[in-house]
Curated annotation (Swiss-Prot):
The gene is murE1. Meso-2,6-diaminopimelate binds at residues 378, 402-405, 452, 456. This is UDP-N-acetylmuramoyl-L-alanyl-D-glutamate--2,6-diaminopimelate ligase 1. Carboxylation is probably crucial for Mg(2+) binding and, consequently, for the gamma-phosphate positioning of ATP. Pathway: Cell wall biogenesis; peptidoglycan biosynthesis.
Length: 482
């Protein structure tokens, strides 16, 4: 494709070279550039793409798109733009022939609940006969084809490539998690969503956004680019989102003020039944994932599907077909007579930890044992808060490591313990040993909640990433110890 066509309506200044140059690959990583390549110089937080212009040209870049003109011009076309990330998003869309225009997109944002909601919507839409793509934290899907996910919302170039592959495979809908990072960093710039869903807003990512207000403003970008907004009105930020979202709006929740609500909840360890009420409609609904917070996830997902014309029968069928979501309040299954349960959950925020522990308490006949830590090189202010929540809502809390990254695990644990006001906790720094300790402590009818890793099958220790799959570890200990 000619550079001129790729640029499209992006404002630019041609520093040198020719707009008629032929391009067949776009990259922001100089190591991945090939012949006839275009290289975007993106300024990151630890490196600046402008420092890699020479390497990109060596690899075959015929075009450099920059925001700062290099002192020594390379022997290729150089185009200067005002905003590198916005230009990359628009040019990426142009290069792949604007694939998002050929899909119906449903975006979901919020601190917690995004992953489960996308799985619910995928199941409901597929029950109605649609081919559905999914983009999110656990994995990306093009129909049934699973593709590894490296971040919740991909960079704009990878995102447009995914959309293009979905169009090629005749996908009708794409349901996607839209992270605050992706909104702030313009990964979804220029994309229009049929439905934008707000789940909740609680403390997370303040290492990146610095203030809660910045975090809120980043989330709100989704609703400026959605035709309709679906808002959890029970969340403390729900009213504000409702006021700030200027498009067609539907609210959901468990209170009377919600447009779409759930009543008469009956919760067990294997799921929840409730009455769905919406505009004179009352239907009995069953979901196979436990916890009141998953009722909220179901309500937002149902609202989106009803908005899209999916019948209530297909909605119920889709929810019933979804047996579980990996690492989301997932009870580890086994073929033994183990008399306690082990629950895996990705909860890595104060709100997430509180919700999974409260949900687990609902079906715990014995003691509730939690195992959790906090990630290194991330928001430190949430550590003592999680310590307080974990110890207060558990009968026994086992404080351990999560992904320490470059931080000393002992220091992270000290930060967590600062928030603990009780003595019902033990410290076991090694996470595998912490799981073993919890399982050895467990008695009949106890429930162990392993919080923080969920679907992840790795642990980051320093600069090393090791294999660490909690489902495998629990199964291994069941065979070894019981």
């Amino acid at each position: 494709m000619k550079l001129k066509k790729i640029i499209g309506d992006v404002k630019y200044e041609l520093i040198c070279g020719d707009l008629n140059v032929e391009i067949d690959n776009l990259n922001y990583d100089s190591r991945k550039v090939n012949e006839k390549g275009l290289f975007f110089c993106i300024e990151g937080y630890t490196s600046d793409g402008h420092d890699f212009i020479d390497k990109a040209v060596e690899k075959g870049a015929d075009v450099i798109v920059c925001t700062k003109v290099p002192k020594k011009l390379p022997n290729c076309t150089v185009v200067k733009v005002e905003d590198g990330r916005k230009a990359m998003a628009v040019m990426g869309a142009n290069f792949y022939d604007n694939p998002s225009h050929k899909l119906k997109l449903i975006g979901i944002t919020g601190t917690n609940g995004k992953t489960t909601s996308t799985y619910m919507m995928k199941s409901m839409l597929e029950s109605s006969g649609y081919k559905v793509g999914l983009i999110g934290t656990i994995a990306n899907y093009i129909g049934d084809k699973k593709i590894e996910s490296h971040r919740t919302t991909p960079e704009s170039l990878e995102l447009q490539k995914l959309f293009s592959d979905m169009v090629h495979d005749k996908i009708d809908y794409c349901v996607m998690e839209v992270s605050s990072h992706s909104l702030y960093l313009d990964r979804v710039y220029g994309i229009v969503f049929e439905e934008g869903i707000f789940t909740n807003l609680t403390q997370d990512h303040l290492d990146f956004h610095k203030t809660f207000e910045n975090y809120y403003k980043a989330k709100m970008i989704l609703f400026k680019n959605s035709k309709r907004s679906i808002i959890n009105i029970d969340d403390k930020y729900g009213e504000r989102v409702f006021k700030d979202a200027g498009n067609d709006k539907i609210t959901y929740g468990l209170t009377e003020k919600a447009d779409l609500k759930a009543e008469n909840l009956k919760m067990t360890s294997r799921g929840t039944e409730f009455d769905l009420c919406y505009r004179g409609l009352r239907e009995h609904v069953k979901i196979n994932i436990p916890g009141k917070y998953n009722v909220y996830n179901a309500l937002g997902s149902v609202a989106a599907c009803l908005n899209e014309g999916i019948s209530i029968e297909k909605v119920k069928d889709g929810l019933n077909k979804l047996s579980s979501v990996p690492g989301r309040c997932e009870i580890v299954t086994h073929n033994t007579n183990l008399d306690f349960d082990v629950v895996l959950d990705y909860a890595h925020t104060p709100d997430g930890l509180e919700k999974v522990l409260k949900a687990s308490r609902e079906f715990t006949k014995g003691r509730l044992i939690s195992v959790f830590g906090c990630g290194g090189d991330r928001d430190k202010t949430k550590r003592p808060i999680m310590g307080e929540i974990g110890s207060k809502l558990s009968d026994i809390a086992v404080i351990t490591s999560d992904n320490p990254r470059s931080e000393n695990p002992e220091e992270i644990i000290k930060d967590i313990v600062q928030g603990i006001k009780t003595d019902n906790y033990v410290i076991v720094e090694n996470r595998k040993e912490a799981i073993k300790k919890a399982m050895l402590m467990a008695k009949k009818d106890d429930v162990i909640v392993l919080a923080g890793k969920g679907h992840e099958n790795y642990q980051i220790l320093g600069d090393k990433t090791i294999h660490f799959d909690e489902k495998e570890i629990v199964s291994e200990f069941i065979k070894e110890l019981f």
